[in-house]
């Protein structure tokens, strides 16, 4: 897009040499460190850092222009003055997506968005050139920046969309314009704003209002809330799950320990067996979602199987690390009651001393104490050997675990730092260690400590 075109799309005013108005931007960035020749830098006033202070830096790095909410007295490069930088970014992303018009698979749900996104992208990549959401770029800014990474040669986009309030999905889906909507499940996340699972269902299904003509809806048919979804805007949902009533279902499910989980997948086109190389029963659901999407877009069952079996784990998302001293399951990117219990169920399949290192789960609303206790009860009955946890809410978790199994070794610490100070003394060589907590607990620091244990 040219600077003149961008100014028009985002409703801004261009300031700079007339001849620069027809210059094409090479990329759009909000991180000043990534700005280079031909970049358009969007200055966003953040809570901690105001992007406007970096305008001189990006100009010296060769940026073509900047978008600013502030009038610049001595602009170091051409700029476009706007009322709201975030609104400008979203307007540009929405326009850019419309121009490309490539098929988009939009993924949402309470649990498993990222692992489902990775699975679907791995499947589709067996036939198409696929761009997928990086890391956790699933909010309005992250989605917009992902859209800007699309190029004409890309054949499909797999975009993750995360929300925590009503109306957010409308804004995300307006940008993404999905052709296919995939909803993984309706759990107990973001209850502070959405209040109930019915509220979560309402917020997630806002995505349906933005599906393209002749779109697809793919949902978890085993989920009691999603199973109530009927035909929407003339689109009949397709279901996946473990119940054979679903169009896509799985049986013969067997844990292969930390090697993964095997199953047989049934589709309207036939059946096949697969070894999913990431542990956990929840991964079967991800494979089923990937299978359904793959069939929608013309992949053979052999291509789908290949995509599933070559799937790779992502750091912080059940990523297995062999340190030489321990086996560490890095699942600390985020946590909620459903995913916490699922991860504990995988840990119990491990060979060796099974240790859960857990932390507080956030955004659970008024039921937070009860939900932590529920996870604690599960920890006390699922067959692990030790539970070490930290955080004020985990006090409820630890107490419930001990009540469920008085013989279970349980230690609770006030905070992560206290836990980290004692953890090396509590662990034994050969331990199989699950590390999981909500992102704000920063349990990645525990993983880093365990990774370096062999080098001490």
Residue ranges of model-derived segments:
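ATP-dependent carboxylate/acyl-activation modules
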Residues: 107, 315-317, 440-446
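Peripheral docking tails and interdomain loops at the edges
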Residues: 430-451
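N-terminal leader/targeting and accessory segments in enzymes
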Residues: 1-91, 377-378, 382-392, 407
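Active-site beta-alpha connecting loops in nucleotide-dependent enzymes
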Residues: 48, 314, 332, 336-405, ...
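Residue-level signal for inorganic ion chemistry
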Residues: 6, 39, 58, 92, ...
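Phosphate-binding loop of NTP-binding sites
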Residues: 7-8, 88-216, 225-233, 425, ...
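Mobile, glycine- and charge-enriched loop segments
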Residues: 34-43, 130, 148-156, 344-365
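Acidic, Mg2+-coordinating active-site environments of NTP-dependent enzymes
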Residues: 9-13, 68, 72-76, 182-328, ...
């Amino acid at each position: 897009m040219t600077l003149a075109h961008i100014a028009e799309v985002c409703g801004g005013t261009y300031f700079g040499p007339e001849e620069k108005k027809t210059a094409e931007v090479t990329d759009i960035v909000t991180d000043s460190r990534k700005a280079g020749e031909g970049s358009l830098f969007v200055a966003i006033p953040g809570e901690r850092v105001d992007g406007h202070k970096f305008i001189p830096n990006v100009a010296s790095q060769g940026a073509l222009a900047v978008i600013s909410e502030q009038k610049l007295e001595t602009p170091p490069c051409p700029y476009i003055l706007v009322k709201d930088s975030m609104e400008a970014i979203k307007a540009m992303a929405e326009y850019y997506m419309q121009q490309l018009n490539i098929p988009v698979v939009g993924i949402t749900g309470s649990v498993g968005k990222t692992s489902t996104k990775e699975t679907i992208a791995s499947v589709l990549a067996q036939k198409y050139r696929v761009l997928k959401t990086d890391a956790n770029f699933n909010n309005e800014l992250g989605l917009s920046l992902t859209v800007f990474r699309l190029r004409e040669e890309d054949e499909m986009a797999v975009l993750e969309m995360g929300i925590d309030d009503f109306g957010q999905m409308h804004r995300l889906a307006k940008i993404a314009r999905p052709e296919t909507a995939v909803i993984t499940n309706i759990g107990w996340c973001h209850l502070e704003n959405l209040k109930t699972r019915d509220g979560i269902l309402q917020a997630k299904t806002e995505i349906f209002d933005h599906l393209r003509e002749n779109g697809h809806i793919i949902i978890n048919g085993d989920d009691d809330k999603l199973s109530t979804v009927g035909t929407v805007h003339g689109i009949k949902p397709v279901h996946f799950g473990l119940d054979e009533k679903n169009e896509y279902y799985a049986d013969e499910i067997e844990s292969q320990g930390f090697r993964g989980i095997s199953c047989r997948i049934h589709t309207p086109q036939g059946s096949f067996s697969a070894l999913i190389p990431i542990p956990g029963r929840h991964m079967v659901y991800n494979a089923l979602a990937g299978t359904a999407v793959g069939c929608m877009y013309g992949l053979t069952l052999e291509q789908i199987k290949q995509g599933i079996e070559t799937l790779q784990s992502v750091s912080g998302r059940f990523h297995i690390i062999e340190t030489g001293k321990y086996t560490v399951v890095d699942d600390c990117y985020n946590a909620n009651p459903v995913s916490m219990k699922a991860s504990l169920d995988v840990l119990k399949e491990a060979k060796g001393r099974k240790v859960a290192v857990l932390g507080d789960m956030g955004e659970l609303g008024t039921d937070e104490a009860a939900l932590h206790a529920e996870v604690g009860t599960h920890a006390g009955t699922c067959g692990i050997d030790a539970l070490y946890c930290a955080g004020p809410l985990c006090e409820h978790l630890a107490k419930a675990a001990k009540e469920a199994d008085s013989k279970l070794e349980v230690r609770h610490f006030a905070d992560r730092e206290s836990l980290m100070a004692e953890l090396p003394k509590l662990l034994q060589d050969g331990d199989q260690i699950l590390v999981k907590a909500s992102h704000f607990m920063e349990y990645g620091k525990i993983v880093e400590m365990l990774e370096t244990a062999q080098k001490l």
